[in-house]
Amino acid sequence: MRHGDISSSPDTVGVAVVNYKMPRLHTKNEVLENCRNIAKVIGGVKQGLPGLDLIIFPEYSTHGIMYDRQEMFDTAASVPGEETAIFAEACKKNKVWGVFSLTGEKHEQAKKNPYNTLILVNDKGEIVQKYRKILPWCPIECWYPGDKTYVVDGPKGLKVSLIICDDGNYPEIWRDCAMRGAELIVRCQGYMYPAKEQQIAIVKAMAWANQCYVAVANATGFDGVYSYFGHSSIIGFDGHTLGECGEEENGLQYAQLSVQQIRDARKYDQSQNQLFKLLHRGYSGVFASGDGDKGVAECPFEFYKTWVNDPKKAQENVEKITRPSVGVAACPVGDLPTK
């Protein structure tokens, strides 16, 4: 893990995160013009950082937030489509990989709300991962939720998963990606005040807890509704910050992520190897007791057992300690039911 140079090496993946200014757009033509601007940014960053292998843009950086429902449907993208073609050409031309936001992606059933989607494009211009946000930011966001995470081989073989904004507030998604082999978890977000300190803290904690690199790209600026705090960052698998932007519009950070170092740590670390220890619980004591050398593999957590085996029961249980309705009468949002 290195920070401060403009290079990369056969073992290191050069990663840049962009504090992209939140656009305020209304039409398809405006969206496509913004895509072309993003393509220009890629070319400029590659010129300045010749070691760049992967560039990451925030959630909503392509479309902005369409506060008008009809505009949201009118500007929703197909994958592949006109927007992705612009990104693909930029990645191919500059020989870099890129992560791009589509808010939204058309639902397969035209009348249903679009998805909030990220795509990972390789340096040949091919879409190698399409991730749909599993946990939209309710009650404000009205995206149709996705249903799974993905892990793919990224630049130089580094294994990459994509997550989006509010997804990252749930430890389960980080653990799912890491347990499936992700070595870099990319979190693209359009996060606004007042949650700045919490969001800076959680990505460090999740990198540490899951022995994984984390790259965060967040929006900046004011779109007339929300003020976005930036602080795009790159975190090492030991939870230390390698590079972090401030609140500057269109700033960026860059670091080199070693493929070998993270694999070495996951293989040889002992006291802080959370991934191994979770599925080999108490192995020291179990071995000393003569009960084998694998520890305990069974899940000890009642909530997770219930969730997997009886999701409706788990939902009912959480309503007992929170509330039974999606809406809140004391502070209604839209037409969400409060009873």
UniProtKB/Swiss-Prot annotation:
EC number: 3.5.1.4
Domain CN hydrolase residues, every copy: 13-259
GO biological processes: metabolic process
Activity under varying temperature: Optimum temperature is 55 degrees Celsius.
Membrane spanning stretches: none
Active site annotation, chain numbering: E59, K133, C165
PANTHER family referenced in this protein's UniProt entry, alphabetically: ALIPHATIC AMIDASE, NITRILASE C965.09-RELATED
Family: Belongs to the carbon-nitrogen hydrolase superfamily. Aliphatic amidase family.
Note from the entry: Asp-167 is probably not involved in the catalytic mechanism, but is probably involved instead in maintenance of the structural integrity of the amidase. Expression of the amiE gene is stimulated in a mutant deficient in urease activity, suggesting that production of this enzyme is regulated to maintain intracellular nitrogen balance in H.pylori.
Reported function: Catalyzes the hydrolysis of short-chain aliphatic amides to their corresponding organic acids with release of ammonia. Hydrolyzes propionamide, acetamide and acrylamide, but has no activity with formamide or urea. The natural substrates of AmiE in its gastric environment are not known. Probably functions to ensure nitrogen supply to the bacteria.
UniProt name for this protein: Aliphatic amidase
Organism: Helicobacter pylori (strain ATCC 700392 / 26695)
